[in-house]
Amino acid sequence: MPDAPRPPRPEGLHEQTIARLNNLDAQVDAGFEAYPYSYPQTHHARDVFAAHPAREEGTGEGGTLEPGQKWEEESYSLAGRVTLMRHMGKAAFADLSDEDGKIQLFFSKQDTAGFDATKKIDLGDIIGVKGHPFVTKTGQLTLHVTEWQPLVKSLHPLPSKFHGLQDEELRARRRYVDLMVTEGAREKFQARSRMIRYIRNELDERGFMEVEGPTLQVTAGGAEARPFMTHHNALSYDFKLRISLELYLKRLLVGGFERVYEIGRVYRNEGIDRTHNPEFTMLELYWAYADYSDIAKLVEDLLSGLAKEVHGSYQFEYQGKTLDFTPPFARVDYLGGLREHVPGLDFDPLDLDRLRAFCDERFPQWKGVPSYKLLDKLFGEFVEPLLSNPTFVMDHPAVISPLAKKHRSRPEAVTERFEVFCSGFELANAFSELNDAFDQRERFEAQTARQAAGDDEAHPQDEDFLLALEYGMPPAGGLGIGIDRLAMLLTDSDSIRDVLLFPLLRPEGGEAEEADDTAQENTAG
């Protein structure tokens, strides 16, 4: 069909862009559409290879490919991006990359309709091809192209196919280019997708119902973190973006649902580092009539199952070390870990006045940190780096766990809460959920006092949530898992932005605030 009139070229284009546009004009002059509306793609590159497997190297077994073989009765219609192009007089070879793989193409003046216009194909162009497979003299399975169609002209050259994008920040800023040219980039995000699908399937099979809570909230609770603010024009009201999924899921337990979960984005107005991004994905679930022991078993099943799903084994490599997700996971008592690993800590760490003096003397850089947060500071400094394989950190102090139930055996000191750490950072956080409305109000009021004293990360008092608790919330276990950090581990990624398709980045030329190392520690409630 005739091409629609194209807009005039802008002024000031780069000479490479002009050359590519000239090639597009030449293809149009040869009778091709510049921007077709669709293309009848019937297969992917992997389908051709699956139909004609090669022999296993060194064994002579598996496939039957021999140089010169051809299957003219077979027809494949593929589409993808051209990543290599070699013209040889009356023939040309190209590499076509699609979502799942790459295949070599062969064009010939004798057999390929529109052969002359292939000389106007630029690296990065997306084309459609039809043809049959054959084996070259060197034994490479190749598609002999009989028909082809330019689908879109790439106006910019691709980075080197050998090196990809080397600059880490540029990879994140130009993710669309990174996905094109960096080896393994797409596979990371495909693994992340499989990971989330596995979690959903597991929870659905266990009777959990997926729900969606509000992103805009009057009171952003469920964690200790600074929220982002936004103004609603029609209501003339300042709302907050959610920092957790917790409190609305608990309202659903009050309403009668017994097993609920949500996988969604949360937002915390905090710094950025290798394990923190202000916008990140959480799984939170709540299970009526369960406690944190039931949740611990569920966590072991989910995490070990995910390792098997992604790697086919409980053991896999992360940053040069072998991690072992074989259940059961190791366990460490929170206060016991502090006493064992913090040098000079020979007193009860719950004596916050002594802890303040102890830290002021040894860690003067923490003098502005609220006393109760020094517990997590010390744990993060001395204990977390020791937790290589997945480890349950059990029974956190009540002063840092405002939404957890007091421990049934040690109610005066600690709560029924655990976190899972692996390779030095937190993956999961879980509680036996507090459902005593008066106890919860007392803890909220303590947090409100901290907020009045200047702690802008103290948990706000949510009166509607307290009212819901007064109607009666069943005993329950709750869990939060940081999906992005889990994806880091399972894809051997050093930074959280390597597993976020579009991570938050500072404006070019600006500076990012470093993350407080207590930020986002409360990944669930």
From Swiss-Prot:
SUPFAM superfamilies: Class II aaRS and biotin synthetases, Nucleic acid-binding proteins
BP-aspect Gene Ontology terms: lysyl-tRNA aminoacylation
One of the record's GO molecular function terms: magnesium ion binding
Known cofactor(s): Mg(2+)
Binding residues annotated for Mg(2+) 1, in chain numbering: 419, 426
The keyword Protein biosynthesis is assigned to this record: yes
Source superkingdom: Bacteria
Binding site for Mg(2+) 2: 426
Alphabetical list of Gene3D superfamilies matching this protein: Bira Bifunctional Protein, Domain 2 (3.30.930.10), Nucleic acid-binding proteins (2.40.50.140)
Pfam family, one: tRNA-synt_2
Root EC class: ligase
Subunit note: Homodimer.
UniProt cross-references to NCBIfam families, sorted A to Z: lysS_bact, PRK00484.1
Family: Belongs to the class-II aminoacyl-tRNA synthetase family.
Protein name: Lysine--tRNA ligase
The organism of origin for this protein: Deinococcus radiodurans (strain ATCC 13939 / DSM 20539 / JCM 16871 / CCUG 27074 / LMG 4051 / NBRC 15346 / NCIMB 9279 / VKM B-1422 / R1)
Phylogenetic lineage: Bacteria, Thermotogati, Deinococcota, Deinococci, Deinococcales
